[in-house]
Amino acid sequence: SKGEDCSDLHIHSDQYEIYVFLRGDIDYFAGNIRKHLVRGDALIVSPNELHRPYLIKETAYERVIIHVNQDVIKKLSTPVSNIYRFLEQYNCCFFHLPDEILNQFLNNERMIQQYYNTKNEFGSDILLETWLSITLIHLIQFLQKNQNKVNEGITVFPDLVKNAIQYVDDHYTENISVASISRYLNISSSHLNHLFKYYTGNTLWNYVISKRMLMAHKMILEQKSITEICYAVGFKNYSHFI
């Protein structure tokens, strides 16, 4: 059946995402790969990586997501237990949590949520970081023991799609278009659009806009002017940007 947008492209400029799928009928796109998910499938996504679920059938969709700020990850890391390094190592890697590990993760996530909801009460901030550390350590220990099972059953994007992504990543601040990208790759615009949509679940132009908006978000945080941001990220028309 024809897939439907489950959401727009996701991108986080300063957060890691731990995603665990529980039920539904979706493909998930991250980095240069996609996977049809089953209960217990999980994914770690680093900051600045585009990712998205893509709904196959109109069924209930349930997942658990934990977002962790990059600075928190660095704070929790030690020379012996460098959580930051391991999350980077497993960026955009799919892995499957067996029932026992999945239930442990869900229990941990409930504790994180409990202390997040009461984080202004005495002790809750410390307990929040403690349970977050426990959850991340459990995940990394599981991955270390099951490295040979990472990215099983994935679909890797063809070179043409990967090259289109790389070209956009390198040139999105310039005056590019789907037509100019197609010319560079020596392929028709319609064929490129079809392939890109099929493998990524999104249009090529949406990918360009997403990259530009990510950079714009960073520059806004740096308190740059809107006009400066508009032209710096590749929008040649101020009205299009706002």
Which residues fall in each region the model found?
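Short hydrophobic/aromatic patch on the recognition helix
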Residues: 40, 191-196, 240-241
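Solvent-exposed, amphipathic alpha-helical segments
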Residues: 24, 104-118, 160-171, 215, ...
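Short, Lys/Arg-enriched N-terminal segment that forms or immediately precedes the first helix
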Residues: 146-151, 198-200
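Conserved hydrophobic/aromatic pocket- or pore-lining residues that grip, position, or stack substrates
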Residues: 135, 168, 192
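Terminal helix-turn-helix DNA-binding modules in bacterial transcription factors
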Residues: 166, 170, 175, 179, ...
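All-alpha amphipathic helical-bundle segments outside canonical DNA-binding/catalytic cores
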Residues: 100-103, 117-134, 155
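A hydrophobic/aromatic-rich effector-binding and dimerization subdomain
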Residues: 1, 47-118, 137-146
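Generic protein-terminus/edge-of-domain signal
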Residues: 1-42, 49, 57, 78-85, ...
